[in-house]
């Protein structure tokens, strides 16, 4: 991993242009990084956030900010996987909006479409900046319903790239329900495993609620699925999109918000005390100014070179 020291004398304008967002400073006993989304409250152009405006606590203890910079050219690499639930066979009417979203991503964004099958994420093609090609790989899922959290864990453990400088983000289209266990459990072990795997892999997971059951299904089951999806999004620094427990008329407002989030993200690198083996810890981030900040609730802390 590249290691740069943020010198206090460097002008903010130079910092914003030249620093790799995930660059690390001098390590303490442990280090980590995260993707942070910074928006204004009324959709204005987001302000520049300087390193001195940011503070963090990891595991309840003050952490040293060793890197903070926006994802702007030339350091704006984004790898995005659109995951589609194997039960979403009623999704056909939304395909035009999904294709448009894929085709209108920023030119440098690499995207792939994955389908949940038998506890795995089956990729329709490689991560590619050819958005028209990726859009052409969109089709209705064919396999039986599977646990979405199994599939997410598989994706996190087998991310289709080794570019450590790129953002890794996921748009997960699902109702969040395990077909083998439809009872809501806030400590669902498969969800917790998916969160751990995603945090360790540095994934930001956005969830788009899409109800696969015809006729609406059971509202208690739907509420439970949404709660699990919400927990997943909050833990990884993503966002959760839904309209009640029914399917949205249009995905367009969601896709517009996603585009805005992709364009307003920062790379955070930090040093924190690590008294044992690499671990998942809680993150509390504070950013000065009138901004809305979305940060992961959990981060992976590890020894230098032990990612």
Named regions from a protein language model:
Residues 1-5:
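Positively charged n-region of N-terminal signal peptides that target proteins for export
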Residues 23-307:
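Scaffold/interface architecture of coatomer-like assemblies
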């Amino acid at each position: 991993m590249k290691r740069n020291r943020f010198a206090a004398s460097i002008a903010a304008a130079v910092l914003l242009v030249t620093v790799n967002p995930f660059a690390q400073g001098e390590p303490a006993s442990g280090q980590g990084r995260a993707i942070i989304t910074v928006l204004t409250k009324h959709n204005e152009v987001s302000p520049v956030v300087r390193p001195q405006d940011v503070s963090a606590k990891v595991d309840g203890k003050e952490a040293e900010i060793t890197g903070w910079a926006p994802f702007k050219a030339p350091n704006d690499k984004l790898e995005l996987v659109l995951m589609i639930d194997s039960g979403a066979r009623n999704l056909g009417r939304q395909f035009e909006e999904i294709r448009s979203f894929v085709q209108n991503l920023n030119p440098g964004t690499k995207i792939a479409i994955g389908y949940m099958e038998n506890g795995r994420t089956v990729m329709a093609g490689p991560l590619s900046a050819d958005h028209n090609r990726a859009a052409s790989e969109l089709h209705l899922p064919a396999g039986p319903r599977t646990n979405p959290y199994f599939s997410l864990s598989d994706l996190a453990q087998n991310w289709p790239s080794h570019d450590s400088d790129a953002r890794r983000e996921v748009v997960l289209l699902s109702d969040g329900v395990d077909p083998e266990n439809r009872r809501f459990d806030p400590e669902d072990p498969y969800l917790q495993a998916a969160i751990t795997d995603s945090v360790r892999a540095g994934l930001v997971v956005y969830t788009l609620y899409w109800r696969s059951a015809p006729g609406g299904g059971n509202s208690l089951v739907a509420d439970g699925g949404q709660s699990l999806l919400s927990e997943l999004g909050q833990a990884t620094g993503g966002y959760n999109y839904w309209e009640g427990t029914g399917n949205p008329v249009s995905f367009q407002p969601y896709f517009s918000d996603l585009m805005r989030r992709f364009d307003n993200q920062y790379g955070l690198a930090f040093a924190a005390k690590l008294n044992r083996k690499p671990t998942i810890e809680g993150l509390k981030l504070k950013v000065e100014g009138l901004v809305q900040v979305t940060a992961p609730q959990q981060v992976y802390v590890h020894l230098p070179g032990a990612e």
